[in-house]
Amino acid sequence: MKKILFLYFLSICCLGFSQTFVVADSLTKEPLAFATVVLDEKEMLYSNEKGVFTIQNQFEKITLTYLGYNDFVSERKLLKDTIFLNPKPFELQEVTITNNNVPLQKIGFLKRAKLLYSLPISPKTELVICIVPVEKHVNSYVETIEFPLRKIKFYNDTDKLYKNVPAVVRVNIYTVKNKLPDQKIFSSEPIKFIMSNKELIKVDISREMIQLPQEGLCFGIEMIGRVNQDGEFVEENSYAQPIFTDNESPDYTAQTYHNAFLGKDNLYDMNVSFNREISRIVKNHTYKNYNLAIGLTLRK
């Protein structure tokens, strides 16, 4: 009997494990929406619009990251209900005054591909395009980044069409090492969009003073998730659908990857899957280089 009771209470503890936390600014005490949470380098989630997140599984180590704040790393046993992130100190950079009449250089979107011209990405994943500029754009400052999104039509179990459903993405920038994304140097504020609309995700980074070096930069669009009326994330039927092109640009060469963030071999060359799928549809298909459609504004 004692053994049965022990197993009963043990099962309740295991099945009922759940911890709720709030992530907030250590100075203002304001909650931080859509912070990235990683558990034991195996599981990833986000805080909601109120900075709240709930952990359903056992874990030993937690890491929280947020734009403009120092990373927070802790063991589970040391955690409190509210996790405070410390803002990074603002560093004044040396600024060179240039001629304001220098025109901006606009790199527009390339024409979308005829077949498989978009790809839905689910929460906790990212599409990343690595760009190597031609000589005239080397060391230009990146002013704006744009990603066009295709509208998504999807249905629930009763075949009711979802409309005007909000979701959240984020734009990331990485350095390049061995032609692959390396260190993250910028992450935008979370950006809301409507999944059932054609959207243009645009980020102004003119204050960041990020230059486009000879080896290039990688630009990613990360899907955080669909948001319900309570500000909570819903992973079911939750997608962003960036546009792809199969045209070559006179301003850069590029390669696009799918990034799953966690685990080994998390980067996947999108050309492999795109060309494989098209070869099943089109006889005598000629290999093409498929990349994210991206728009950039540069300044010398």
What are the residue ranges of the model-derived segments?
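A short, amphipathic beta-strand motif
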Residues: 19-27, 51, 83, 95
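A short, solvent-exposed loop/turn motif at the edges and junctions
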Residues: 63-76
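Surface-exposed turn/loop modules enriched in turn-prone residues
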Residues: 140-202
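Short, acidic Ser/Thr/Gly-rich low-complexity loop/linker segments typical of extracellular
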Residues: 42-52
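Short, well-structured beta-strand segments enriched in hydrophobic/aromatic residues
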Residues: 205-246
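PGST-rich, cysteine-poor low-complexity/disordered linker and tail segments that act as flexible spacers
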Residues: 245-300
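Short, acidic, small-residue-rich periplasmic hinge/interaction motif at the N-terminus
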Residues: 65-67, 84-118
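Short, ordered, surface-exposed loop/turn motifs in non-cytosolic proteins
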Residues: 27-41
